[in-house]
From Swiss-Prot:
Protein's UniProt keywords contain Ribonucleoprotein: no
Alphabetically ordered keywords of this record: Cytoplasm, Lipid A biosynthesis, Lipid biosynthesis, Lipid metabolism, Lyase
Protein's name in the database: 3-hydroxyacyl-[acyl-carrier-protein] dehydratase FabZ
Catalyzed chemical reaction(s): a (3R)-hydroxyacyl-[ACP] = a (2E)-enoyl-[ACP] + H2O
Gene: fabZ
Catalytic residues of the enzyme: 58
Record-listed E.C. numbers: 4.2.1.59
GO cellular component: cytoplasm; membrane
One GO MF term attached to the UniProt entry: (3R)-hydroxyacyl-[acyl-carrier-protein] dehydratase activity
Function: Involved in unsaturated fatty acids biosynthesis. Catalyzes the dehydration of short chain beta-hydroxyacyl-ACPs and long chain saturated and unsaturated beta-hydroxyacyl-ACPs.
Organism: Bradyrhizobium diazoefficiens (strain JCM 10833 / BCRC 13528 / IAM 13628 / NBRC 14792 / USDA 110)
Length: 153
């Protein structure tokens, strides 16, 4: 993220996310997105609670938030950033998650953690977007990946 890049949206709350993405419980995996900047970067926020449906099976004796959920949340954060960034100039209505590259899981995420999905654009070609994401808990990277998506109308 470029600190000098102007902020376009300081806060996209859950109500705005529900208007932007088609995802709903249990697959809506971000609570808000903050600091969407003109350079197509921003931060998704997820407050992880023990009530997450995934914890029923991952793992009952030692709950660990699934890495696949973090990757999906990165894609959702990138989708919000992409749609909000072109709002008013284009009319995308759907985001399709297409690729995952360079994915690494570094530390477990536990109930009570707050995950910050730091996403920044790697580039765009017409309706295709590529983002790099770092998932962080307390400032430490717990997962990272490059994700690709397509915005369509």
């Amino acid at each position: 993220m470029t600190e000098g890049s102007p902020i376009k949206f300081e806060l996209v709350d859950i109500n705005a996310i529900l208007q932007t993405l088609p995802h709903r419980f249990p697959m809506l995996l971000i609570d808000r997105v903050i600091n969407i900047r003109a350079d197509y970067s921003g931060i998704g926020i997820k407050n992880v609670t023990f009530n997450e449906p995934a914890f029923q099976g991952h793992f009952p004796e030692r709950p660990v938030y699934p890495g696949v959920m973090m990757i999906e949340a990165m894609a959702q954060t990138a989708g919000v950033i992409g749609i909000k960034s072109v709002e008013g100039t284009e009319k995308p209505r759907a985001v399709y998650f297409l690729t995952i590259d360079k994915c690494k899981f570094r530390k477990p995420v536990l109930p009570g953690d707050t995950i910050e999905y730091h996403m920044r654009s790697l580039g765009r070609r017409k309706t295709m977007w590529w983002f790099h994401g770092d998932a962080k808990v307390n400032g430490q990277v717990v997962a990272e990946a490059d994700v690709g998506a397509m915005l369509t109308d």
